[in-house]
Design a protein with these regions (language model features):
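Phosphate/nucleotide-binding beta-alpha loop and adjacent structural elements of enzyme active sites
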Residues: 1-131
């Protein structure tokens, strides 16, 4: 793999990184650098605690500009969002209470370009957006 990559690492960006990097990347850990963005402070702490040396975990939301945003912390962490839940739609499904907002926090959002520049990243090979 080193020969194929010419001794460079793949750069993987995970936007909305709750749960961490997808397990299918686990066999290639030594060949990639992961940049994980997770705005939920609860999930960020878990990611930071369990991250490998090849991962940079950033507690930030991404947006089209640098600005303050509202973030809705939901009962189930993985469904927290900058958008309030639409219960007119969600109540049509089982388990809609997982979207109950427990708290609204204010946090700074920034652009992907700005965040990558701060980390010295010029190029990205893969990006997963789950927001």
């Amino acid at each position: 793999m080193d020969k194929l990559l010419n001794n460079n690492h793949l750069v993987i960006v995970d936007v909305g990184a709750s749960g961490g990097i997808d397990p299918r990347w686990s066999k290639t850990t030594e060949f990639y650098k992961g940049i994980l963005f997770e705005p939920d402070p609860r999930e960020f702490d878990a990611l930071k605690k369990n991250s490998d040396n090849n991962l940079i975990v950033i507690n930030s939301a991404l947006s089209d500009s640098n600005k303050e945003i509202e973030f809705h912390l939901c009962k189930k962490q993985e469904v927290s969002s900058v958008y309030p839940p639409n219960f007119n739609f969600l109540n049509k499904f089982a388990d809609s209470e997982r979207f109950n907002v427990e708290k609204i926090i204010h946090l700074n959002a920034d652009t992907l370009d700005n965040q990558l520049k701060k980390e010295g990243i010029d190029e990205v090979d893969f990006i997963k957006i789950d927001t």
